[in-house]
């Protein structure tokens, strides 16, 4: 049996950014107008520095207007998370299925991940209802993987496809980072509010040897470093916590997981022409680039997505892969999807274009 017959394939995928677009100058103005009464002069100066950084031009948010975010009550925030996590993931799934020439009736499995909100029953049940998926579909809702969550999701979806005797499995990642917006003089919050946005993505997996061959994957966990990047609970709400040491920690985990996934197929970094690297911020991207030895020209898609969308947490790597496909991936060329985040963790998936 050939490798193509053994491996699952990504038939298609699609992205769905949130509808409200704000450039960084507008976002900075909103922060100053809404929170200056609780911020120190040092924090206000830092806001200007980080919001005017040239690496990010604009971001997308799941809101109707910025007024939504001011003094948003927890119940209203969770309702917004629920509404938009379902809406954006549904859009991505519908687009991805259409691109593969499939319908909702073809879907036999669904895996959904998020880290920016918790609802029970999970997002998958809302999608069954909204999209008209089979009531006997196999579904899994994953939480807690942070920005790296798309790849563990893919691993579960791949196992679901192989273990279920084929069919069509959908892998959906959605984050409403604005549903965790908080602001005070904590540098973690200031940095987060300049970096994160909202969006969703979905991939369609099947066994046909068409699309992107799912060749190998790997993950690395450093649990003793979990406090360097995580959500913490305060008064029943999520607060993002980021360490300034992250670039020097993430790069090591990222390099290790890339080495693992390449070694499994006797490949080296120079064999990989396409890199879908998570947009964790310019310093982290640079640190990962230097530690792994990725040529800067191979990061143009990551830089572009960072500029136009910021960091949307888990679905972001799909936006980068979408940009790579638009740039062009030739048959038999290798691509590595690389994501990292809470855990501290790093995840990689090796693809080959069919």
Regions found by a protein language model. Give the residues of each.
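Secondary-structure boundary elements
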Residues: 98-104, 160-168, 205-212
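Claisen-condensing/thiolase-fold acyl-transfer catalytic domains that form or cleave C-C bonds
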Residues: 3-4, 90, 116, 129, ...
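A short glycine/serine-rich beta->alpha loop
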Residues: 75-81, 112, 139-142, 188-190, ...
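Conserved beta-ketoacyl condensing-enzyme motif
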Residues: 48-133, 144, 269-285
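Short, well-ordered amphipathic alpha-helical segments that serve as non-catalytic structural scaffolds
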Residues: 52, 85-100, 200, 249-265, ...
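Condensing-enzyme catalytic core mediating Claisen C-C bond formation in acyl metabolism
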Residues: 1-82, 168, 177, 181-252, ...
